Design a protein with these regions (language model features):
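Glycine-rich, proline-tolerant flexible connector loops at the mouths of alpha/beta enzymes
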Residues: 39-63, 78, 115, 195-201, ...
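Alpha-helix-loop-beta-strand connector modules within alpha/beta enzyme cores
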Residues: 50-74, 130-134, 333-347
């Protein structure tokens, strides 16, 4: 099993110093690079302090200059906020700058609040259509001159300048949850990023079943790489289990606000809504969070990861950004690198 790191620059309150956040994030990425992580992912979000990522290509170019071998992924470029020519050129330039380390992840976006500001009138549930139109256009632009007449974009003949270093193009990933996205990924030979949120292991099993169904319905297509992401925190003593759980509950209260457009945002800081008022409140029970998320001592984490490995998860994504203190984040990553990853070393 290979390992990926997903990390954001995050400020939980106005008291958090941005320069310290910047330094900490880069140090975490450098730890992952030195520790043998396969990919590090940068997100795209707008006007939110909890995920400071207005342009993933800029973030990854920054990380590329300070790392040696780790691959650099967008997770994800939000298709409705971009034009295909912009994305093709930005991605190709990053691939050149990083000496061919780009992993290109594309998706449809998550928060209705962002759509209301970045693409007024678009419902989050309809945004997948933009992703499915954009990706073939980007691949064509990487190959040469191409004109596009689609539902959402139209442009005369153009090409990507520059072209990607990797041939025929960088590895492509799509964020997938719904069956239609798994079918699209298999048909277009895209790797799959899955995120079961706070749900139990059965959610991962469901995603893998959707992948198998898509493969069965598209004979002749090869199986893409399948990754699963979880909030992750490794700690020294079992009695510390509530530290990441409490941090996760605070962040998830902000996530639900943004996902459901159910609360306010003050100068970039989302309010935390009352999780007990939600229909899905059982998903945020502390003991369930401890069980379902990748929280535990090194030995406990190894046991949890064995379940993912046995299911057929190819790569696990360590989601580091859950509002923990910087010291706790670094200790967690250190324990994961030194005491967990060696148990999954490839022969």
């Amino acid at each position: 099993m290979k390992f990926q790191l997903a990390i954001n620059m995050e400020r939980i309150s106005p008291d958090t110093d941005m320069a310290a956040v910047e330094r900490h994030t880069l140090e975490m990425v450098q730890m992952a690079d030195a520790g043998g992580f396969h990919i590090v992912w940068a997100a795209e979000h707008h006007a939110l302090e909890m995920t400071i990522a207005p342009n993933p290509f800029q973030i990854l170019t920054w990380w590329a200059a300070h790392t040696d071998r780790i691959r650099l992924g967008t997770a994800v470029v939000v298709a409705p906020y971009w034009h295909p020519i912009n994305v093709a050129g930005e991605a190709a330039l990053l691939d050149l700058y990083s000496n061919g380390r780009l992993e290109f992840g594309i998706g449809s976006g998550a928060y209705q609040r962002e759509f209301d500001r970045m693409h007024a009138g678009l419902k989050q549930t309809d945004a997948w259509r933009y992703m499915q139109e954009m990706l073939p256009a980007i691949k064509a632009l990487w190959q040469g001159d191409y004109a596009h007449e689609g539902e959402y974009w139209r442009f005369p003949e153009a090409t990507s300048v520059p072209k990607p270093l990797q041939k025929p193009h960088p590895p492509i990933w799509v964020a997938a949850r719904a069956p239609i996205t798994y079918d699209y990924a298999v048909k277009h030979q895209c790797n799959i990023m899955s995120w079961p949120l706070t749900r139990p292991m059965s959610e991962v099993e469901t995603y893998l079943e959707r992948l198998q169904t898509a493969l069965d319905e598209n004979p002749g297509q090869s199986r893409p790489t399948f990754s699963a992401m979880r909030h992750t925190c490794v700690y020294d003593k079992k009695e510390d289990w509530m530290v990441p759980v409490e941090a996760a509950r605070r962040q998830l209260a902000q996530f639900e606000n943004l996902f459901k457009n159910a609360g306010g945002v003050d100068n970039g800081f989302p309010a935390m809504i009352d999780l007990s008022t939600l229909e899905n409140r059982d998903e945020y029970d502390p003991k369930m969070l401890h069980e379902h998320l990748m929280f535990g001592t090194p030995q406990e984490i190894v046991g949890k990861l064995r379940l993912y490995d046995d299911l057929g998860v190819d790569q696990f994504t360590y989601y580091a950004s859950l509002g923990l203190g910087m010291k706790e984040q670094k200790r967690s990553l250190e324990l994961f690198i030194n005491e967990v990853m060696p148990e999954f070393a490839e022969d």
